Amino acid sequence: MSDYKSTLNLPETEFPMRGNLANREPVMLKSWTEDGLYQQIRDSRIGRKPFILHDGPPYANGSIHIGHSVNKILKDIIVKSKTLSGFDAPYIPGWDCHGLPIELKVEQKVGKPGHKVTAAQFREKCREYAAKQVDGQREDFIRLGVFADWNKPYLTMDFDTEANIVRSLAKVIDSGHLHKGVKPVHWCTDCGSALAEAEVEYEDKKSPAIDVAFAATDKAALLAKFDVQDCTGSASMVIWTTTPWTLPANRALSVSPELDYVLVEFVKDGATSTVILADALVESCMERYGVESHKALGKAKGQELELLRFNHPFYDFDVPVILGDHVTVDSGTGVVHTAPGHGQDDFVVGQKYGLEVANPVGDNGVYKADTEIFAGQHVFKANDNVVALLEEKGALIKHEKIMHSYPHCWRHKTPIIFRATPQWFISMDQKGLRKQALGEIEQTQWIPDWGQSRIEKMVENRPDWCISRQRTWGVPITLFVHRETEELHPDSISLMERVANRIEREGIQAWWDLDAQELLGDEAEQYRKVTDTLDVWYDSGSSFSSVVASRPEYQGHEIDLYLEGSDQHRGWFMSSLMISTAMNGKAPYKQVLTHGFTVDGNGRKMSKSIGNVIAPQTVTNKLGADILRLWVAATDYSGEMTVSDEILKRSADAYRRIRNTARFLLANINGFDPVNDLVAVEEMVALDRWVVRRAAALQEELIEAYEQYNFHVVTQKLMQFCSVELGSFYLDIIKDRQYTAKGDSVARRSCQSALYLISEAMVRWIAPILSFTADEIWQLLPGEREKYVFTQEWYQGLESVTLDSDLSDEYWEQLLTVRGEVNKVIEQARREKQIGGSLEAEITLYADDALSQALATLGDELRFVLLTSKTQIVALSSAPADAIETEMTSLKLGLHKAESEKCERCWHHREDVGQVEAHPTLCTRCVTNIEGDGEVRQFA
């Protein structure tokens, strides 16, 4: 054989079988950075239509986790695919840099502001800490192969961004959406600050659940409403609550106007009591109270009870009955204890009746000094004391402990309270913001489409947005308020612009250093500076304006896409929508895409305590970033995204299939010159023309899937093409022609041309997902080319040509099926040691008339398709009893071992081996390929 080895066209490539990605990727990254690849891409798209994906800024605290990786990789796939589609798609990464988590980290190091360090020093320490966190996260994102303007990201703490945040607030104020009010807000007593809705998490909590009696002030008036003459003892209205600590702030009892209420007399422990309960809840209440007997004395609609008065159970005043639509009969008594200072529904209904918004609780969760009985007690600790006092007063009907879902601080993981405080709000209704935002939601494309109804419900039900915080590290609310009237300065808008100009030069510290007299002159004594800071959700939510407007890359183009996790419907998508609609009357985005959360193989959330956390850094160091990128792309992100070591191993296996395909392609076009050796598609062997046609059709499907952000469809179709059409069919068939045909014959060049065209297309198909591997392939492709695939567009060289004489795509599909059946028979024969390789087999195909005619079209070339030394076609009706059944009703098979000599060069068993005296071990085909003009192939 050694004599003829040099006559074969053996595959050869520098592209290694093993990716060794963990070691090879960092070398490529270094090259990309040194060559300024991101800028090269930007330069290649000057003047093209822009596509703007605006980055939702991750918080600058801690290492990135797998969810961050998913998010950034999805964005990167989109930006790269849009670039391939010819768009100018800049990507400016951002970071959220203000807020409580950073304050807490800095407090651990330097203490609270005003103690060991001044507030100004504290802010500087926060800035330093955030910058360091950004650097760490940036390195991790770069390692993932994400292309972005990493040298010039946007940080919400950049001076110009801070200034633009102030300018955006000025525009919101100018549009009439800001108001100040005393309202109940989510309040964390550990933070000492209001919380945004997105900063509230719901966890199970054990709480006291109590039924409390409020005795009627005028028993006769009450009985008259129920058309009852008399009853035993006093008549009371009963409330049920899980927050006894809010009872000092009770100012009313709410009933539903349409519900029926019943005056019930019951006996318990020998004593008779008379109470008012919702009719629908009487039986459940009596059961809970453990009464011996009960009877209904009378019935009345809730609206008939309006403004009756009842004594507070332990304070010396009485409260009215009011009507509220928020009252339900889902649980409790059908009567709601109403404390306008401690609940949103309570506040809203209280406003209608002009109730006092009592707030006896301080910032730290302790009752204020003027709170009767409970002064100085922490509210949660006071619960037991309230219960004890109610029992002492004879007002406690039932006391038990229940587990229920309760709001907790996202940072401290501790229960929070609702507490009325003076705050700044963006009003949802005073200028029609809610209605406008709902209209804008309809104009936006939501992916998946359920995102629309989700955010609609949130906007429909959300309260006014409390944008003020009582924190040190944040963008200040740069307003001057009149000391007596609490009115804003009449020149607030122009004053805010002057302050913004200072912040642009000096950062937010400029506000704290500002002497009011510098701006207000003689008026300074009448006004005070607001000391509140903005909710960090305002920082990020205004970035469509504060960032996009200031970056020349965006050319003033509107944002096309926001892409974040599904929790951002109530977070960044919401805050951005509110601010943009308040400022500009329209949504900031055209499309909003959400991805699910990452969970482990058992569907559990990632948790250090469970020990199921998969860190992206570990994956890139062990398997390489391309494996992580392939997992992200292959997973349907519309639901939960499952990841585990086993799943990543499967991704690595899938990656190997793609890599092996690429290696085969490169190894077989080694030395191919696209300028001189390329065979026109119409002159190719039919099988080659078919595979190019398939690749062209696939490219259209892949581009469409990329455009619809269906990356799992991209990977599925790509894997199918590599595994089935190429791996199991085309590449297997062409090996004989590729290796044994004359080196420069049309038969071989046709095949190489097809492989070359597929390689040029495929390297682009995988570039958005397997970026490192695509670059590796690109560097080894033959022909003149730009340095990087990432500056290219989708390949235009795939011509979908079908000649009149061509076999149809359906024909090749049928042949693929026949070949699959033949393979099964050959494999069985190999397992039974009947033959060694497939070329030792001679196959008889017993086919019906239609299939016989189809197979006969290929003539002698059928054996190359079936990878056997000899084939013969016989009528199905002539099949012997021992013919092998297949899954095709039109086909049976026969196999026997070839008896002819084996050609030393091509390994086919042929009767003509040794016919040429000079080459006694070769078939005549091989002699032609060595010494003659080379064999001619028409079909395969």
Swiss-Prot record:
It comes from the Bacteria. Keywords: Aminoacyl-tRNA synthetase, ATP-binding, Cytoplasm, Ligase, Metal-binding, Nucleotide-binding, Protein biosynthesis, Zinc. A motif ('KMSKS' region) lies at residues 605-609. Zn(2+) binds at C903, C906, C923, C926. It holds the Pfam family tRNA-synt_1. Binds 1 zinc ion per subunit. It is found in: Cytoplasm. Belongs to the class-I aminoacyl-tRNA synthetase family. IleS type 1 subfamily. This is Isoleucine--tRNA ligase. It comes from Shewanella sediminis (strain HAW-EB3).
